[in-house]
């Protein structure tokens, strides 16, 4: 087993009370200076630990002093930072797309904690010295190298000692008009979860994250490497914030619009968000992702620095836009975490929401102080969203082979050669898994999967995943495995929603639901007479497009062309305009068009 490297920081600490220095984070008016020196750890018998096979160690420890007291900082490489099929895309001056798969597994981005402190954490980049932050005795400290010739000096300081870039409060443009009523949230927060729901919430979930940098932000950086480093640091920080929600964020791709922007960039954040969502919907399969964010150098109108659709995981709208408004990486990452929270079904915190280290991530104002954690309101609202919508893409966990570099016991990833991995000795709460060896305890068959209870396989025919609706099927444990079988769906054509529709690929598409989705709850499907317009074959009313021409519907197929809606208690024919793309105004495939008939390829055919 490769032993952890012990690195001791031999300190000469010089408090600079009242002094000021310009660091990467800005003007810092009070800091301490430390001088790191690496010392190899010794194995038993006094033998020196061999040189690592990779440039950066998988685990490290740093010993130093904070306020005159010694601390030991444990670091573990964030092995899941990049997905197995991570790609980077940029564009040549002539517009040619250049996509590569760089070797990123031997990276220098770490998570960690302070030894003997239960409520501690750390996010560190060790690429060129130590840069990041750690929480110690309830206080957050930042560390970064000092740019002094022939010196390994680092500065340690608190956030309160960084002069603010701009006193104007920033905002997220998601407004209260998109919230549910307080009454409905209060009612759901009082509900008790079923055992099946609790099991679902406890299952580890994953976001395959795609990040895009626009042309202006690209031009604002001196080199591609500087830009990549900044992005990696943001995602490393983002990853730690979602641990409480039991999510792991894996960067699946970075795209830099180095030649020109691929969408219309507009100071109106809502316009840019819509354009970005439309662009993402057309990405090729090799750039698939669960969520995408656009980082932009443009200045959004007013004090807006971010915007996202709410409750859109695993859909076309799982996107956000964030303005590159601060040179401080942690502030940018805080805003990214905030916008991703909206995609995960979380609204802004209300006045009665609290977290132990304010401001909370979903605060309605984005200040110059970093966000550190979700409030209890956010956690509960996110859980209600997951239980209500059951987004499927987040359950696709990386295979063991996706971890290309050497396995590390204690990183919460079950890798090749491991039977379980419950985290570090400090974090592990499992009675089934040995945190030191990542092997099951002698009495255990399993650890924490859906078909595991008290370290034993659940009996055959024990339900492990309930049917979420008419078009889903329940899954049952086999009695031979801890894994719940793959999610299975009701057959296409099975009646659903009281015969209002027929199942199609796990959903129950109806015209009424499509109108509500596109226009809101005050709308329903239009009268039958509206659909006769589809016989025209004009730009608005038609059945399909062929080589740019609008093809009219036959009379029997008129309900399989353009969708018509109407406002409840009113008359008229309304063609909805989707923020996704113009084609989504068409009646969706699989929608019921007559009794025992559904739309297929713009025709009304038998089920």
UniProtKB/Swiss-Prot annotation:
Residues 406-492 form the Disintegrin domain. Residues 1-20 form the signal peptide. Ca(2+) 3 binds at residues 472-473, 475, 487-488. One of its GO terms (molecular function) is metal ion binding. PROSITE patterns: ADAM_MEPRO, DISINTEGRIN_2, ZINC_PROTEASE. It comes from the Eukaryota. It comes from Naja atra (Chinese cobra). Monomer. The keyword Cell cycle does not apply. GO terms for biological process: proteolysis. Residues 21-196 form a propeptide. This is Zinc metalloproteinase-disintegrin-like atrase-A. Disulfide bonds join 314-393, 353-377, 355-360, 409-438, 420-433, 422-428, 432-455, 446-452, 451-477, 464-484, 471-503, 496-508, 515-565, 530-573, 543-553, 560-599, 593-604. A motif (D/ECD-tripeptide) lies at residues 470-472. Binds 1 zinc ion per subunit. It is found in: Secreted. Residues 205-398 form the Peptidase M12B domain. Ca(2+) 1 binds at residues 208, 290, 393, 396. GO terms for cellular component: extracellular region; plasma membrane. Belongs to the venom metalloproteinase (M12B) family. P-III subfamily. P-IIIa sub-subfamily. CDD domains: ZnMc_adamalysin_II_like (cd04269).
């Amino acid at each position: 087993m490769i032993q952890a490297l012990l690195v001791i920081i031999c300190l000469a600490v010089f408090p600079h009370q009242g002094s000021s220095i310009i660091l990467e984070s800005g003007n810092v008016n009070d800091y301490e200076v430390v001088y790191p020196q690496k010392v190899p750890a010794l194995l038993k018998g006094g033998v020196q630990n061999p040189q690592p096979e990779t440039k950066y160690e998988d685990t490290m420890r740093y010993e130093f002093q904070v306020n005159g007291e010694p601390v030991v900082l444990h670091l573990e490489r964030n092995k899941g930072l990049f997905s197995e099929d991570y790609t980077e895309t940029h564009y040549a001056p002539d517009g040619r797309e250049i996509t590569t798969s760089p070797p990123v597994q031997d990276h220098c981005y770490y998570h960690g904690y302070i030894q003997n402190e239960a409520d501690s954490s750390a996010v560190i980049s060790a690429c060129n010295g130590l840069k990041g932050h750690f929480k110690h005795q309830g206080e957050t400290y930042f560390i970064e190298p000092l740019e002094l010739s022939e010196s390994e000096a680092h500065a340690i300081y608190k956030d309160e000692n960084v002069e603010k870039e701009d006193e104007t409060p920033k905002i997220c443009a998601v407004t209260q008009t998109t919230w549910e009523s307080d009454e409905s949230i209060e009612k759901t927060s009082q509900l008790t979860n079923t055992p099946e729901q609790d099991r679902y919430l406890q299952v580890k979930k994953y976001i395959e994250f795609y990040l895009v940098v626009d042309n202006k932000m690209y031009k604002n950086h001196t080199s591609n490497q500087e830009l990549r480093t900044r992005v990696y640091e943001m995602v490393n920080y983002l990853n730690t914030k979602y641990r409480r929600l039991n999510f792991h964020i894996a960067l699946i791709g970075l795209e830099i619009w180095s030649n020109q922007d691929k969408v219309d960039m507009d100071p109106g954040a809502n316009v840019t968000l819509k354009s970005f969502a439309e662009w993402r919907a057309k990405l090729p399969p090799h750039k698939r992702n669960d969520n995408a964010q656009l980082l932009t150098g443009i200045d959004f109108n007013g004090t807006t620095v971010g915007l996202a659709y709410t409750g859109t995981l695993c859909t076309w709208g799982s996107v956000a836009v964030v303005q590159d408004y601060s040179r401080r990486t942690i502030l940018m990452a805080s805003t990214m975490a905030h916008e991703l929270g909206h995609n995960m079904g979380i609204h802004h915190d209300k006045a009665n929401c609290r977290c132990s280290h304010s401001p909370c991530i979903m605060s309605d104002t984005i200040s110059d102080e970093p966000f550190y954690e979700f409030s209890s309101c956010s956690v509960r609202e996110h859980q209600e969203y997951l239980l209500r919508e059951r987004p499927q893409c987040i359950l696709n966990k990386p295979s063991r082979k996706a971890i290309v570099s050497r396995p590390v016991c204690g990183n919460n990833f079950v890798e090749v050669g491991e039977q379980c991995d419950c985290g570090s000795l400090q974090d592990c709460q499992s009675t089934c898994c040995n945190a030191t060896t990542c092997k099951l305890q002698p009495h255990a068959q399993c650890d924490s999967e859906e078909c595991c209870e008290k370290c034993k396989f659940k009996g055959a025919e024990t339900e492990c995943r309930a049917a979420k609706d008419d078009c889903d099927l329940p899954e049952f444990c086999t009695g031979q495995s801890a894994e719940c079988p793959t999610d299975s769906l009701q057959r296409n054509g099975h009646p659903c929603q009281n015969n209002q529709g027929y199942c199609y690929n796990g959903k129950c598409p109806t015209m009424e639901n499509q109108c509500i989705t596109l226009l809101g709850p005050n709308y329903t499907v239009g009268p039958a007479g509206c659909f006769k317009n589809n016989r025209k074959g004009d730009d608005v009313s038609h059945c399909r497009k062929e080589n740019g021409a609008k093809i009219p519907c036959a009379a029997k197929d008129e309900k399989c062309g353009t969708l018509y809606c109407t406002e409840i208690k009113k008359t008229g024919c309304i063609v909805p305009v989707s923020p996704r793309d113009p084609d989504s105004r068409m009646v969706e495939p699989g929608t019921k068009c007559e009794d025992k008939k559904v739309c297929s390829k713009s025709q009304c055919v038998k089920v």
